[in-house]
Amino acid sequence: MSECTHDCSSCGESCADRQGGSPFQIKPLHEGCHVRKVYGVVSGKGGVGKSMVTSQLAVTMQRRGHRTAILDADVTGPSIPKCFGIHGRAVGSEDAILPVQTETGIQLMSVNLLLEHETDPVIWRGPVIGGVVQQFWGDVLWQDVDYMFVDMPPGTGDVPLTVFQSLPLDGIIIVTSPQELVSMIVSKAVAM
């Protein structure tokens, strides 16, 4: 870890030495929860393998001895539970939701884990979807996570904006393919 240079424009939102107020409102985790590092996984276009990359990153870090989690922010097109063969439902109380765990202990939260049938469509507008993503961050009992990967929907719409403004991201991972159209859209996502 490097020494603080007090150039706060170059540090992450979770930096303990950060000076000045953030223009965004970072939502706190549920009481007693701790997540050390948060990485958003984004793409400019659907179908480039973003959810598979997200899953592989979590598995790789888990195999290296870290506790990992995936927050599936692709609310209208969730696929993370399917990547792990999870078909059960998340349980909770009035106070919190428990993440579902894979066979190897990766913690997952996805809208598909809350639906009665995983094939039920989610037909919600932007503000509702953004609220769900914030609830997945703040109302789920994440259990001592070293690395959380946030699988986002493609593009630069409401969900990526909500994640960038309300979760303490330490970085983003951009998944792309070589097509010219995809490169243009990825450039827009990077500029966010």
Which functions belong to the PLM regions below?
Residues M1-P28:
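Cysteine-cluster motifs in flexible loop/terminal segments that predominantly coordinate metals
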Residues K37-V75, V190:
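Walker A/P-loop phosphate-binding motif and the immediately C-terminal alpha-helix
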Residues D146-M192:
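Conserved catalytic-core segment of NTP-binding enzymes
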Residues G92, V111-P127, V132-T162:
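Switch II (G3) loop of P-loop NTPases
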Residues H30-R36:
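Phosphate-binding P-loop
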Residues V35, G46, D72, I80, ...:
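Residue-level signature of catalytic and energy-coupling elements of molecular machines
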Residues G32, G77, G126-Q134, G157, ...:
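Amphipathic alpha-helical transducer elements in NTP-driven molecular machines
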Residues R67-T68, A73-E118, G130:
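Phosphate-binding loop that captures ATP/GTP phosphates
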